[in-house]
Design a protein with these regions (language model features):
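Non-catalytic accessory segments flanking enzyme active sites
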Residues: 54-57, 89, 100, 123, ...
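Beta-strand-rich domains and repeat architectures in extracellular enzymes and scaffolds
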Residues: 41-78, 344-345
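Cap/lid segment of the alpha/beta-hydrolase catalytic domain
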Residues: 376-502, 509-510, 515, 537, ...
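Active-site-proximal cap/loop segments of hydrolase catalytic domains
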Residues: 460-693
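C-terminal motif of bacterial Sec signal peptides marking the signal peptidase cleavage site
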Residues: 14-16
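Multi-bladed beta-propeller domains
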Residues: 19-53, 80-100, 129-146, 176-194, ...
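A flexible loop/linker signature enriched in serine peptidases of the S9 family
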Residues: 50, 68-76, 94-99, 106, ...
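Hydrophobic beta-strand positions that form the internal "hydrophobic ladder"
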Residues: 62-65, 111-112, 159, 205, ...
């Protein structure tokens, strides 16, 4: 099921890897300078350029170490013998957007990766044979997005893949041969199934089907058909779902919020239906889980309130996790475990610390060898990165808003997380909105803080992870109470001396871009300026143009937002659309958009830009012809952020690195408003556009 409507464009723009820890660059603690001029300017290239290495993994047999790294400036997959990193070689040859998402199959010397074209999110699945370095498209069909359903060590030569080439709304299920690329039909999806669960033998066991009321039917396999055995009410649709199946098929894991507020992880006996609680946290929903690679049994469960904490439920790895926890005060994540579970790849990071990759060879009692391999972004080692401070704010109606504050180095001399003096602030709003902000390294937080701004990220109502009541409190509240929470957070920051009322900008991607537009139209006196990245301006056209394969989620979506197919719904969505209040805009606005965005179409940005232009309201519009829902190519990401940096400096008074050569290799265009950002028009005159899909 598609849990996120509008994944954060900021996150997409940063993603060069598959785990958050992979994105964490380096930092060091030094004496705080008295003024911003005393803080070293961190180059945008170090923050937003390609990582040196990311998404580090071991093959299941432990034979190879792999990672993502640049090849001629474009991210590709590299492989080395596990014991000889100097023998690394690139095994993919992408020259456009780069490879970010990859994983190992159980077929010897074969890995898999996903790639779309120009940000259209029609992801194809490719197999790479390391003996020949040849890539094969396993899903070679137009307008098709692949969904990987199963990869099993019991059937190493094949994978289960959903493909929507027959019907763009629904994925049929195929078994695909990794050597030949041939596919054989497992199930033609005539039941409008949104999610399949198969066991280790690729036998279909469970599925979900959307209900007209926005809830879900839970189905189980009976013979060659399906029967409904339970349901998920609409209210639990965001917080309840399947969470895995043990390899013997005897235990089904579910995250379940039915009959409670926060969801918990349960183990269900597939033969008897007996349900056993594995882990719960009264403050938050359960998060990720670690499972034994041999059995599939859950061994540890995460919960993230202010920071992520792991609860061990299998003593077999208790000593190992304690060993990793002792690396430092940051957070350790396990990227991969070999099939025999003897070797782990670990990424350690903190908000202001580098990602450090470790190899951990287990001895069974936590005393194995833990060896550091390398840093993901060594260019940031020794740079003045700053901490992130978790906060618990109060909304006007008494809700707790878990938030995160980042202060510029010169504004927090004693490092206590409290501002010594007010500084300009950027309210950085996450996407989704069914997502959350969390502790950890953020290149945007570090960039903005280094330029002299405090950064506040708020988990407003509607965010996920804090129980279904908090998530459901956002229903029908786009541009309503969800926005009130953001305003309350700004008022908190002013009252705490973090900033002043006249020096607050709002910025965000996707839903965060929408929140930016709402900020400048619904509350036009609150913010000094706004930066909108792929944010929708017209909720009616947004919901009328979602990708066809969102069909399994659409009923829930419109119930939470409004139905564009009813007159009442249209009126409601129009009322909550920034486009209807363009006349109210009186502060500077910068908009960034990808021309191929399948979620928030280019027309969303075009509509508000055209409306503003017709009313002679200034706006700067940056458009990338080879991007989608966010800016994946580092050249484009750096180009947009160079523009945003100059825009914010003019608005808030922070410092800005000149645009310089930052447009090199990018596809940037500025259809209107280049004169609104210092140096932008001049930089465009000398720029030669490079479009890569």
């Amino acid at each position: 099921m598609h849990r996120l409507l509008l994944a954060s464009a900021i996150t997409l723009a940063l993603s060069a890897c598959s785990s958050k820890a992979d994105e964490v660059p380096a930092g060091s603690q030094t004496a705080a300078p008295a003024t911003l001029d005393g803080v070293e300017l961190i180059p945008r290239e170090a923050l937003f350029g390609n990582p040196e290495r990311a998404n580090v993994q071991l093959s299941p047999d432990g034979k190879y170490l792999s990672w993502v790294a640049p090849l001629d400036g474009t991210l590709n997959v590299w492989v080395a013998p596990a014991g000889d990193l100097s023998a690394a070689r690139a095994v993919t040859r992408d020259t456009a957007r780069g490879i970010r998402s990859y994983f190992w199959s159980y077929r010897p010397d074969t890995l898999l990766y996903l790639r779309d074209s120009g940000g259209d999110e029609d992801f194809h699945l490719y197999a790479v044979d390391l003996t020949s370095d040849q890539s094969r498209d396993l899903t070679p069909f137009e307008k098709t997005t692949a969904q990987v359903v199963g990869v099993s060590d019991r059937h190493p030569g094949t994978v289960l893949v959903g493909m929507n080439d027959r019907d763009p709304q629904w994925h049929d299920l195929y078994r695909v041969d990794l050597a030949s690329g041939e596919r054989s039909l497992v199930e033609r999806n005539t039941h409008q199934i949104g999610e399949y669960v198969a066991d280790a033998d690729y036998v279909l066991r469970y599925a979900t089907r959307s209900r007209p009321d926005g809830g879900l039917d839970l189905l189980r396999r009976v013979g060659e058909g399906w029967e409904q055995y339970d349901e998920i009410p609409f209210e639990d649709g965001m917080t309840t779902g399947f969470a895995g199946l043990t390899k013997d098929g005897g235990t089904l894991y579910m995250r379940d919020s039915r009959g409670r507020n926060t969801n918990a992880l349960f183990a269900i006996d597939t033969a008897t239906g007996e349900k056993t609680l594995v882990h719960e946290d009264p403050r938050v929903d359960v998060g990720g889980a670690l499972a034994d690679p041999v059995t599939g049994k859950v061994q540890a469960v995460a919960a993230n309130y202010l920071r992520e904490q792991w609860a061990v439920v299998d003593d077999a790895i208790a000593a190992d996790l304690a060993r990793l926890e002792a690396i430092g005060p940051g957070e350790a994540s396990i990227n991969t475990r070999t099939l025999d579970d003897k070797t782990w790849i670990v990424a350690y990071s903190a908000a202001e610390s580098p990602v450090q990759y470790y190899r951990y060879d287990r001895d069974g009692n936590g005393g194995g060898e833990l060896s550091r391999m390398f840093s993901g972004r060594p260019a940031l080692e020794g740079k003045p990165l700053v901490p992130m401070w978790p906060q618990e704010l109060r909304s006007r109606d008494g809700k707790t808003l878990v938030s995160y504050l980042t202060l510029p180095a010169h504004a927090d001399g004693n490092g206590d997380g409290k501002a010594d003096q007010p500084v300009p602030m950027v309210l950085l709003v996450h996407g989704g909105p069914w997502a959350r902000d969390a502790y950890g390294y953020s290149s945007y937080d570090q960039w903005l803080a280094n330029r002299g701004y405090a950064v506040l990220s708020v988990n407003f109502r509607g965010s996920t992870g804090f129980g279904k009541d908090f998530t459901n409190a956002g229903d029908g509240e786009w541009a309503g109470k969800m926005h009130d929470d953001l305003i309350d957070a700004v008022q908190w920051a002013v009252a705490e001396g973090v900033t002043t009322e006249d020096k607050v900008a709002i910025m965000g991607g996707s839903y965060g871009g929408y929140a930016t537009l709402v900020g400048l139209t619904f509350t036009p006196d609150t913010f000094a300026c706004g930066v909108d990245i792929v944010g929708p301006a017209n909720l009616n056209t947004l919901l009328s143009t979602v990708p066809p394969y969102w069909a399994s989620f659409y009923k829930q979506l419109v119930r939470r937002m409004g139905d564009p197919e009813t007159e009442e719904g249209k009126a409601w969505l129009s009322e909550r659309s920034p486009l209807t209040r363009v006349d109210a805009i009186k502060k500077p606005l910068l908009i960034g958009q990808g021309a191929n965005d399948p979620r928030v179409k280019q027309d969303e940005s075009d509509q508000i830009v055209n409306a503003m232009t017709a009313k002679n309201i200034p706006v700067t519009y940056v458009l990338f012809p080879d991007e989608g829902h966010g800016f994946a190519r580092p050249e484009n990401n750096k180009a947009f952020n160079a523009v945003a940096e100059g825009f914010l400096a003019q608005c808030l008074g922070g410092r800005a690195q000149p645009i310089g050569e930052e447009f090199k290799g990018s596809s940037i265009t500025v259809p209107t408003g280049a004169e609104g950002v210092p140096g932008l028009a001049e930089a465009l005159q000398s720029h030669t556009q490079e479009v890569r899909r």
